[in-house]
């Protein structure tokens, strides 16, 4: 049970339309995200708005002839159905959270075998802090993937979220997605 009535997903209008007309398709999610391949939401409306704006700016920087607009999808939660799901919840950005994020994001098999991850969607839902995308995480992942460092060498506070970054709740199975329903678009 997550105890939240509404969740928000910040995106761009073309992807929002796809979700509105076809539903969430987990296969369209990118690999190597914080909590593994999944559909990412947040209980923080403002964080979702900022995410949508950031995604629109990034898309438009490379597609000036066909610009997109930010959109936020609002989902209602059926909290009674969450109890039947396999869940992992991180309250704070501590060492276990960092190892989980790094194991999901890097490509090294030995890291996947040594540390908990969600590459196989063993968790229906994962919640916790959003890793800071200020450019600190990508070099760390590169160092892990090339063997320049081990997870034990990583200072996880380097990519721990800033105070203003929101919590994320990710859905990794269709069973989990059945617990949320699209209500409106902002």
Identify the meaning behind each predicted range.
Residues 1-3, 32-35, 49, 54-186:
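Conserved NAD+-utilizing ADP-ribose enzyme module
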Residues 2-40, 46-57:
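Glycine-rich loop/turn
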């Amino acid at each position: 049970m997550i105890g939240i009535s509404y969740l928000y997903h910040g995106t761009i209008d073309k992807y929002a339309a796809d979700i509105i007309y076809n539903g969430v398709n987990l296969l369209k999610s990118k690999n190597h995200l914080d909590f593994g391949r999944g559909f990412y939401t947040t209980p923080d409306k403002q964080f979702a708005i900022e995410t949508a704006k950031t995604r629109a700016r990034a898309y438009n920087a490379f597609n000036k002839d066909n610009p997109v607009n930010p959109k936020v999808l609002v989902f209602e939660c059926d909290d009674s159905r969450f109890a039947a799901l396999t869940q992992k919840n991180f309250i704070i950005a501590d060492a276990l959270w960092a190892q989980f994020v790094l194991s999901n994001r890097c490509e090294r098999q030995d890291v996947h075998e040594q540390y908990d991850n969600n590459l196989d969607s063993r968790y229906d839902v994962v919640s916790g802090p959003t890793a800071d995308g200020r450019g600190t995480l990508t070099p760390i992942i590169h160092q892990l993937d090339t063997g320049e460092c081990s997870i034990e060498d990583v200072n996880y506070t380097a990519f721990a979220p800033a105070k203003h970054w929101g919590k994320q709740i990710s859905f990794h199975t269709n069973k989990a997605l059945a617990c949320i329903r699209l209500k409106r678009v902002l």
